[in-house]
């Protein structure tokens, strides 16, 4: 069947902490598909129950929700129950990868490199001295299940650590305290199993937080950022990371270098941002893939 004859919904917005970013991504994706002649409707899931999609005659979904039910497997399961094909990862990969803790457990189990971490759960006693003894300072404190750097803190002093953990626990019941990696930061897109050129991120500020990601015009994105040899090295790690958690369609995997320039995996973004600041289209452009063609390719990969 020709997808252009189907009624397609771009799902965006929603109610997660990443709602605003998703609204921008959704608008861009909807406009791109319309420009290519698709029968497409943009739908903010804050305004409609998912089960109503079938009643509206929706035959296929481009899922560009960030965080929440759009990336944790709930939406994916509902769409499968209704028999509606959708873009991106399936139920299992979506559920696993929104949880940074369990993603890292899987990666570590197969020998993939990640930052060292201490896991803190809401309600448990927190031993600040023990954390510092293991990881030293500075450290990153982050909720296990939030994206877009929501609730992430860089902690430089012992006095800042407990307040940062307490604040992060407002967003999730599990918080990761991770060693601070001193090397360069990269984000590496994967499209239909092919690893695209890594994008180096030089943030406006101390780290790549929400402001640097979505609001600042001073954050620098360098692509291509690596020599062919280093790109091949990171691609091997990223492809293994993508496969072991069961990703499909498209995803973007964040990576950092440690002090010895070894790559360490950070996290997976199963519904990458598609705004004017977004990394995925910047990387795709170096391969001769326009924004519109990238959107169309992701849609074609929907199952």
Curated annotation (Swiss-Prot):
Pfam families: Dala_Dala_lig_C, Dala_Dala_lig_N
EC number: 6.3.2.4
MF terms in GO: ATP binding; D-alanine-D-alanine ligase activity; metal ion binding
Lineage top rank: taxon: Bacteria
Free-text cofactor note: Binds 2 magnesium or manganese ions per subunit.
Any one GO BP annotation for this protein: regulation of cell shape
Binding-site residues for ATP, renumbered to this chain: 132-187
Record keywords: ATP-binding, Cell shape, Cell wall biogenesis/degradation, Cytoplasm, Ligase, Magnesium, Manganese, Metal-binding, Nucleotide-binding, Peptidoglycan synthesis
Cofactor: Mg(2+); Mn(2+)
SUPFAM superfamilies in alphabetical order: Glutathione synthetase ATP-binding domain-like, PreATP-grasp domain
GO cellular component: cytosol
Pathway assigned to this chain's UniProt record: Cell wall biogenesis; peptidoglycan biosynthesis
Binding site for Mg(2+) 1: 254, 267
Record localization: Cytoplasm
Stated family: Belongs to the D-alanine--D-alanine ligase family.
Stated role: Cell wall formation.
Family annotation (HAMAP family): Dala_Dala_lig
Protein name stated in the entry: D-alanine--D-alanine ligase
Source species of the chain: Haemophilus ducreyi (strain 35000HP / ATCC 700724)
């Amino acid at each position: 069947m020709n997808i252009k004859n189907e009624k397609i919904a771009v799902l965006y917005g929603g109610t997660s902490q990443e709602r605003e970013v998703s609204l921008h991504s959704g608008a861009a994706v909807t406009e791109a598909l319309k420009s290519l002649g698709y029968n497409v409707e943009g739908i903010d899931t804050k305004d409609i129950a998912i089960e109503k999609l079938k009643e509206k005659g929706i035959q296929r979904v481009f899922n560009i929700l960030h965080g929440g039910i759009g990336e944790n497997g709930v939406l994916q399961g509902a769409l499968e129950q209704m028999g509606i094909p959708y873009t991106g990862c399936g139920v299992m990969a979506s559920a696993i990868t929104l949880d940074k803790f369990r993603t890292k457990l899987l990666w570590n189990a197969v020998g993939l490199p990640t930052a060292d971490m201490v896991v803190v759960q809401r309600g448990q006693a927190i031993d600040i001295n023990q954390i510092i003894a293991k990881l030293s300072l500075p450290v990153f404190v982050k909720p296990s299940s939030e994206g877009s750097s929501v609730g992430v803190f860089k902690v430089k002093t012992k006095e800042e650590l407990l307040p940062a953990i307490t604040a992060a626990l407002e967003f999730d019941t599990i918080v990761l305290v991770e060693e601070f990696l001193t090397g360069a930061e990269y984000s590496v897109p994967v499209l239909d199993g092919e690893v695209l050129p890594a994008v180096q991120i030089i943030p406006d500020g101390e780290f790549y937080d929400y402001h640097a990601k979505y609001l600042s015009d001073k954050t620098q994105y360098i692509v291509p950022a690596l020599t062919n040899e280093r790109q091949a090295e990171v691609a091997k790690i990223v492809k293994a990371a993508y496969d072991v958690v069961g990703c499909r369609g498209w995803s973007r995997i964040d990576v950092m270098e440690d002090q010895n320039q070894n790559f360490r995996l950070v996290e997976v973004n199963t519904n990458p941002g598609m705004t004017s600041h977004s990394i995925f289209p910047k990387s795709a452009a170096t391969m001769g893939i326009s924004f519109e063609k990238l959107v169309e390719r992701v849609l074609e990969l929907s199952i």
